[in-house]
Amino acid sequence: MLYSEDDKRKQESYRIPLFGSEEESTSIPKYVLKKEPMEPRIAYQLVKDQLMDEGNARQNLATFCQTYMEKEAEILMAETLEKNAIDKSEYPQTAELENRCVNILADLWNAPKDMSYLGTSTVGSSEACMLGGLAMKFRWRNNAEKRGLDIQAKRPNLIISSGYQVCWEKFCVYWDVDMRVVPMDKNHLSLDVDKVFDLVDEYTIGVVGILGITYTGKFDDIQLLDEKVEAYNETNEHQLVIHIDGASGAMFTPFVNPELPWDFRLKNVVSINTSGHKYGLVYPGVGWILWKDKEYLPKELIFEVSYLGGSMPTMAINFSRSASQIIGQYYNFLRYGFEGYREIHEKTKKTAIYLAKTVEKSGYFEIINDGANLPIVCYKMKEGLDVEWTLYDLADQLLMKGWQVPAYPLPADLSDTIIQRFVCRADLGYNVAEEFAADFADAIHNLEHARVLYHDKERNDSYGFTH
């Protein structure tokens, strides 16, 4: 066989050290597809190097998302990446594992034994919230038509506190629902239940209770909300229902505070969503939604798909996706059991309370959430404090040590209040927390002793929150 000079050059490239390769000595195309292939080892290193200046995920205290799983879980998930979760006829045992997860959650959330609960996995709580909202809207529409209400007279509405996650705003925009927001104020840093019923009318599809507000970590008073909804339902033909956005709290509270009534034990709570990739301890992204009974999921939202080899019902918005996260969730349920989850979450709670006390002892901050309900520590600068620095400056100082701790304004009527928040996850052990506490103290010391400290009156950085 004859070889050209190009062939010889390519053969020689396999004997050239990685950083002596042609690809490492020239600029690679970044926004168009390069013409020639390259060796796997070089492609791997180039991509890895592109990511080199990003933050350390475990030091990212802004995110609720899980950043650590055991090696056995990682191997299992890597081995199942090719499985398509939607193809239940091809992968019946994967479908069975998903079904087991739904049943485990139904038991955790106290689904009534005399009702026919049902649920599904999703790519995260954002999709799960969309499904919960759609179920409420379709059920409201069906019931409104039976009552003879003119459903075209005006748009349906949804009631939620201003501490909502952005997916609810998306839901309302995508599906033509008015969002009626109950503003948080200094006396109500969660849902002001008394103000809910100032916004209710016959076009209200439901009320959302939040078990773990993204901004602060606080819980809405779901039990009080249920009592008020029940009183309303007793005197009105239009029946209100409650959906619980438990993206953060629904996989934490059952283990550390099982007596707290927030779930299907409450009569008017008809659906709950959560994020498996938060306190379910799975890598992103997997979410879950359950309905207390099949009557709360209108049949129009269940679709039969037959072109994957067998007829199967599906209710998710998303279609093709890897089953690896579902399998990771089942691994965790099997691996930890109730006591394992409880021990992990109690440890995380202990870490959060320790850090909250550390922040408070510094003397500069007023604690808004101390991590006792959900391991989120949230605080603001004390009023009347005579310092030249802000929480934004503190965030910058912490970032110099690799810690990502966001500062941001509260929503709506509290937008003049700047707070800072960090999320304690399972991988933030007590020893690492001590290191963070030391870095936190050093950051304050540096700010207090800075010779020149300049910052704008307003910070233009925007912070987003995702499920």
Curated annotation (Swiss-Prot):
Cellular component terms (Gene Ontology): cytosol
Lyase listed as a keyword: yes
Name used for this protein in its record: Probable glutamate decarboxylase gamma
InterPro entries from the UniProt entry: Glutamate_decarboxylase, PyrdxlP-dep_de-COase, PyrdxlP-dep_Trfase, PyrdxlP-dep_Trfase_major
Catalysed transformations (reactions): L-glutamate + H(+) = 4-aminobutanoate + CO2
Keywords attached to this entry: Decarboxylase, Lyase, Pyridoxal phosphate
One BP annotation, GO: glutamate catabolic process
SUPFAM superfamilies in the cross-refs: PLP-dependent transferases
EC number: 4.1.1.15
Family in the record: Belongs to the group II decarboxylase family.
NCBIfam families given in the database record: Glu-decarb-GAD
A GO term for molecular function: aromatic-L-amino-acid decarboxylase activity
Location of N6-(pyridoxal phosphate)lysine modifications: 278
Cofactor: pyridoxal 5'-phosphate
Organism for this UniProt entry: Listeria monocytogenes serovar 1/2a (strain ATCC BAA-679 / EGD-e)
